[in-house]
Each structure stands twice: as C-alpha cells, then as structure tokens.
Amino acid sequence: MRILGIDPGTARMGYGIVEDAGAGRERAVEYGCLETPPDMRPELRLQALYRGLADLMARHRPDALAVEELFFGRNVTTAIHVGQARGVVLLAAADSGVPVREFTPMQVKMAVTGYGRANKAQVQRMVQALLGLPEIPKPDDAADALAVALAGLHSERLTARLGGLS
C-alpha cells in the first residue's frame, strides 16, 4: 500500500509518499515540496503544481492520495489560495485515477500522535519516529504532508481489516 500525502499551497505544496513496510511499520519513499515563484501568474502557478503532481503520481503510482480538508482561518486570501491548490490536487488525482481521502487536521494529529490536539513539534517528532528518519523532515510543508500520508495509510489499513468498509 502506497499513499501520497499532500499539504496544499500555491507557493509551496508539501508532498510525502509513504508505504507499508510490513509488520505494522511504515517507510518514507520520497518527500519534499513543489514550489512556484511568487512573481508567476496565478494560472501558471496552478499549472506548474498540476504538472508536478501528475509527475509524482506517474512515477510512484500511489494507491490513494490523502489531503487535509480546508481549514478556514482568519486570512480569507490564504484560504482562497489553499482552496485553489486543493482543486489542483483533486483534479490531478482524478486524472490519474487515484482515489482521494480527506482528513481534518485533528484526524491527522490523532492518527500520528494519538492526540488530536498535538502541536506541530509533537507531530513532526512522531513523523520522524514512525518513519525511522534520521531527522525531522524539512521544510515543515513536507513534514505535514508525511503526517497526512501516514493518516491515509492508517485509514487504509483499518479499512482493509474491516473488509473494505469505508
């Protein structure tokens, strides 16, 4: 089972690919960020992100894509940009035939740390520990994407144990 986790954004989109390593363990396959320059026209930024995502899915052939649900904070402009990036993620997944699983930030924290109100540092340390990484993944967007991917992997495992119920 291989899951592509995404932390959406238009300037920097974090991605993390994890897979089941057997015996209840997980392994990081690849992680990083797709970045677009701030002076690039918005439609070209979204196109660049789409192409980067399509390339990741073609190379790694994930069984599912996991993405955080949109969190609407105080900054409406940021929420709009994140919403646009999420749209690109959903389109790229649909074009690649990859099913999408969405998680709230609390669900991601619960899946990774066992505590839905864990702080960012606690989540990052658990991502490092669960994946056996020598250091906390950087930048933060990549660590967040790995956490989302782990939530997706844990959810897929549970669904498989329950006989495919979703």
Curated annotation (Swiss-Prot):
Binds 2 Mg(2+) ion per subunit. GO terms for molecular function: crossover junction DNA endonuclease activity; DNA binding; magnesium ion binding. One of its GO terms (biological process) is DNA recombination. It is found in: Cytoplasm. SUPFAM superfamilies: Ribonuclease H-like. It catalyses: Endonucleolytic cleavage at a junction such as a reciprocal single-stranded crossover between two homologous DNA duplexes (Holliday junction). GO terms for cellular component: cytoplasm; Holliday junction resolvase complex. Mg(2+) 1 binds at residues 7, 141. The active site is at 7, 68, 141. Keywords: Cytoplasm, DNA damage, DNA recombination, DNA repair, DNA-binding, Endonuclease, Hydrolase, Magnesium, Metal-binding, Nuclease. InterPro entries: RNaseH-like_sf, RNaseH_sf, X-over_junc_endoDNase_Mg_BS, X-over_junc_endoDNase_RuvC. Its EC number is 3.1.21.10. Mg(2+) 2 binds at residue 68. Pfam families: RuvC (PF02075). NCBIfam families: PRK00039.2-1, ruvC. Homodimer which binds Holliday junction (HJ) DNA. The HJ becomes 2-fold symmetrical on binding to RuvC with unstacked arms; it has a different conformation from HJ DNA in complex with RuvA. In the full resolvosome a probable DNA-RuvA(4)-RuvB(12)-RuvC(2) complex forms which resolves the HJ. Belongs to the RuvC family. HAMAP family: RuvC. This is Crossover junction endodeoxyribonuclease RuvC. It comes from Symbiobacterium thermophilum (strain DSM 24528 / JCM 14929 / IAM 14863 / T). The gene is ruvC.
